């Protein structure tokens, strides 16, 4: 992922909360909803970890998404998860309408186990739900020494090129490649829409007007009564409207992810569109991949070439007013270092939502 200084920007009305405190409270909320302890801790780790890295669109702001759907029963706290591997390097995991974060964890573990013995492993997940920010899973593989790949489809939010209906998801793609020890890792995490839904919601919550090119021009973007982006405000594919600025390329990437995560695993497209509103199972699918770096060349040689590439890019000419060229993942790593020391910044509107859930569930609220 690369977000420049955005990962360091903090809303003025934010409260700083220590990571361990936030994780404990969030995990407690999910345990009350009958999510097993280990799974609740994993969910809390990912959601708080997103805020830790400055990815506010996928952090504590997503807690109500899960709790609401667990409460309605469209996401199951204790699903029947099944896995089968038709070949030594491919597998299919049936998530049983459970929490996507839990299913993705199992799938990436299976992919890495395949890669350890056969050089690579890919697992498709079906009948799942939101799996957090895609980079979390690619990074998990990277931390174990593999090239990590993760992607997911999602409910209809993005209009195809020349269309106005929000029929495709934001369908993120993440790739993480381990660099030299103590050097720079490569960590790309991107939506195939111009931005993720959560980024538009974050901007609107903070009183900012989303930049042109984020949302279609038919309806001005606005939040509904639950603080969620209205479905009559479809996002644009990466590249924007039409073909002049490459919108058809973002549309193509989104459709590619849809096919790899949906058709490949057998999760129905129509069911996913229906599930976007939260009244039925989300019906999402994911793809997890792990590849051994030394399956091509000695790992140290690959990493040395990576570092040389990064050096040439950093040393290239910069645009006026810019003092640095980032490598994907650097801004988030720097944000994490700051937030571990100072606490994660949580805007008041998110704290208010969490307070309401804490009261309803009978758990401690976030401290002030």
Which role does the model predict for each range below?
Residues 58-112:
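Active-site cofactor/substrate anionic-group-binding motifs, chiefly glycine-
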